[in-house]
């Protein structure tokens, strides 16, 4: 057989195989389609059965829910009907109670009307009786009603006026006694708790020398050294027969301190000539400035005062080198601060403000030789300049009466200032001036007409005058006290204040037999 024939046979076989394959595939596809149709019908039937079951179940649930809702609505309706019935019963009860009250009110109103009528009848009867009595009284006394009223009112007015005057006097006396007692207690406690160790200072200072030959070196050739030192410091150097000592005299303690430091440095150095003196004086001034600041800071530390301006601290330090009647002003200010704080504590007041004012009250004395005006006013202006509070400014200006005090602390500082100044040994006068002042006080008092005797007491701070009662009455005593005060103020010079006490005593003696 040729090749072509084989090829044809192969092709025929392939075609037959393809046809058989297609037939087999088609048959299997028809079988699968038939099975799928059967499965679909089965699933559809199951779904229909499930849907029918769920439908029935939903219908049952809906019926149950409907039954529950109907039962709930019926229950609520029953409760509402019960509530309405209860409210109706309450309303009926209230209506019945209101009816009873209304009936009772009507009965009371009727009873009140009857009583009102009786009262009106009684008032009418009383008016008739009153008119009869008034007419009868006018006939018997011979006075009209207005005259009788005026007479009675005048009698009552006199009695009330007298009783009021007696009561006022008793109250004033009791209040004064209580106030004096409390004031004495406060001042006594404050003085007991304040221990001051500083008394009067002098206006001279003694510088010790290693030998008397040093006096000649201090004087210098033709006195040039002593003149230079006196010119630069403004202090008098007194060189006398006192062995190994030179006296520095001056009323400005700062200058005196500068001179002391400079002179002591010159003595230690040994080189004493005008150029060296000038150098030492400059160093001494710087040392004093440093000392002034340290003293001011120490004063604030001792009193517990904080927040002061640095310039106020410096002015406080300068007060160490100021004296008033021999009393060191810085020590006096510290003492016043403590006293004011203690008195404030005794009175139940915060002592901080009182202590602050007490420390600063004499700050004006640090510059009063540079600025014109009373030191209290100067001090208040300085405090205002350095942003102290209005109460502090007022209290400083008022501590000598130059301003009207606006706080209790200002009054306390006035009292503390007087206590510190009046303390024995705080301020010094010469014995001769002291005796002359006492004699002059008694002389002024004895010159007045009607004076029986007078005594200067309390170290010259009080003059007690006994007058003749037959010559002077109470008004005359008041006038005499004022006149004596004016005469003392015009003729005498004295520290602090002087109390003028005029006493008029009348005695009446009778004997019972």
Curated annotation (Swiss-Prot):
Disulfide bonds: none annotated. Pfam families: HD, KH_1, RNase_Y_N. Its EC number is 3.1.-.-. GO terms for biological process: mRNA catabolic process. InterPro entries: HD/PDEase_dom, HD_domain, HDIG_dom, KH_dom, KH_dom_type_1, KH_dom_type_1_sf, Ribonuclease_Y, RNase_Y_N. GO terms for molecular function: RNA binding; RNA endonuclease activity. Residues 35-59 are annotated as: Disordered. Its main location: membrane. The chain crosses the membrane at residues 6-26. Residues 329-422 form the HD domain. Keywords: Cell membrane, Endonuclease, Hydrolase, Membrane, Nuclease, RNA-binding, Transmembrane, Transmembrane helix. One of its GO terms (cellular component) is plasma membrane. It is found in: Cell membrane. Residues 203-288 form the KH domain. PANTHER family: RIBONUCLEASE Y. Endoribonuclease that initiates mRNA decay. Belongs to the RNase Y family. This is Ribonuclease Y. It comes from Clostridium botulinum (strain Okra / Type B1).
């Amino acid at each position: 057989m040729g090749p072509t024939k084989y090829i044809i046979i192969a092709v025929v076989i392939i075609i037959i195989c393809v046809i058989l394959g297609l037939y087999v595939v088609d048959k299997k596809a028809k079988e699968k389609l038939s099975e799928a149709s059967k499965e679909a019908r089965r699933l559809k039937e199951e779904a229909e059965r499930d849907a029918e079951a769920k439908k029935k179940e939903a219908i049952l649930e809906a019926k149950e829910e409907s039954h529950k809702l109907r039962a709930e609505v019926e229950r609520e309706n029953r409760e509402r009907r019960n509530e309405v019935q209860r409210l109706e019963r309450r309303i009926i009860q209230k209506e019945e109670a209101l009816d009873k009250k209304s009936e009772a009110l009507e009965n009371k109103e009727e009873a009140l009307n009857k009583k009102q009528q009786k009262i009106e009848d009684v008032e009418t009867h009383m008016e008739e009786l009153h008119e009869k009595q008034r007419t009868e009284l006018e006939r018997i006394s011979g006075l009209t009603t207005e005259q009788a009223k005026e007479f009675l009112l005048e009698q009552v007015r006199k009695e009330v006026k007298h009783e009021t005057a007696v009561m006022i006097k008793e109250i004033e006396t009791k209040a004064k006694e209580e106030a004096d007692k409390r004031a004495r207690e406060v001042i006594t406690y404050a003085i007991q708790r304040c221990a001051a160790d500083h008394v009067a200072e002098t206006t001279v200072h003694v510088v010790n020398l290693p030998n008397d030959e040093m006096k000649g070196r201090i004087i210098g050739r033709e006195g040039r050294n002593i003149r230079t030192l006196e010119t630069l410091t403004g202090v008098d150097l007194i060189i006398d027969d006192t062995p190994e000592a030179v006296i520095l005299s001056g009323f400005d303690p700062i200058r005196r301190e500068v001179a002391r430091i400079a002179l002591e440095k010159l003595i230690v150095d040994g080189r004493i000539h005008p150029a060296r003196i000038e150098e030492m004086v400059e160093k001494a001034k710087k040392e004093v400035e440093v000392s002034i600041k340290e003293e001011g800071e120490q004063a604030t530390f001792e009193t517990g005062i904080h927040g002061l301006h640095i310039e106020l601290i410096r002015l406080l330090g300068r007060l160490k080198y100021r004296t008033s009647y021999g009393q060191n002003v810085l020590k006096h200010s510290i003492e016043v601060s403590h006293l004011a704080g203690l008195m404030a504590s005794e009175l139940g007041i915060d002592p901080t403000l009182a202590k602050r004012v007490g420390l600063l009250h004499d700050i004006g004395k640090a510059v009063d030789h540079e600025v014109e005006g009373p030191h209290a006013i100067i001090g208040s202006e300085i405090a205002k300049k350095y942003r102290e509070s209005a109460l502090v400014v007022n209290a400083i200006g008022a501590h000598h009466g130059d301003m009207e005090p606006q706080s209790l602390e200002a009054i306390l500082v006035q009292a503390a200032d007087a206590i510190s100044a009046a303390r024995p040994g705080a301020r010094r006068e010469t014995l001769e001036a002291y005796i002359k002042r006492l004699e002059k006080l008694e002389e002024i008092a004895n010159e007045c007409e009607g004076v029986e005797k007078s005594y200067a007491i309390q170290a010259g701070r009080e003059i007690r005058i006994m007058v003749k009662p037959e010559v002077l009455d109470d008004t005359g005593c008041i006038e005499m006290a004022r006149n004596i005060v004016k005469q003392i103020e015009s003729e005498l010079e004295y520290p602090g204040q002087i109390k003028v006490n005029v006493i008029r005593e009348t005695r009446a003696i009778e004997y019972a037999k």
